[in-house]
Amino acid sequence: MGPEESIRIQSMLGSTIAMAFDECPPALSERDYIEPSVERTTRWLLRCMEELKRLRSLPDTLNKEQLLFGINQGGILGDIRIRHAEEISALDLDGYAVGGLAVGESHEEMYRILDLVLPHLPREKPSYLMGV
């Protein structure tokens, strides 16, 4: 499965919110794994945006008002998390999720990452803490 198929499936379900296709690296992954993973997630987000735009133009799309949420990733590496939050926030999505937490890191690490990331996501848009 890829980003386009993920968005098509969510569209066929008629869901109110579609979550962008992302990669959730294992909690304690090293920087040399997380950096390309986050870059891939951003590329996939752009592809999700294009596919949703295409689907909205089709006459038989169930929910032409479907919202798209981008997912912040970056493991427990604060600098990558902040950079990724800023990158996806610049795309003016319908909402934003923080993913890749509560997957093996300590509660303290999870809260530390949330404290770092949330100020870099738009306050006027919905936000969602995935999997918690």
Residue ranges and their predicted role:
Residues 39-42, 51, 55-59, 63-132:
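Glycine-rich phosphate/ribose-binding loops and adjacent secondary-structure elements
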Residues 1-61:
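Non-catalytic, usually N-terminal nucleic-acid engagement modules in DNA/RNA processing proteins
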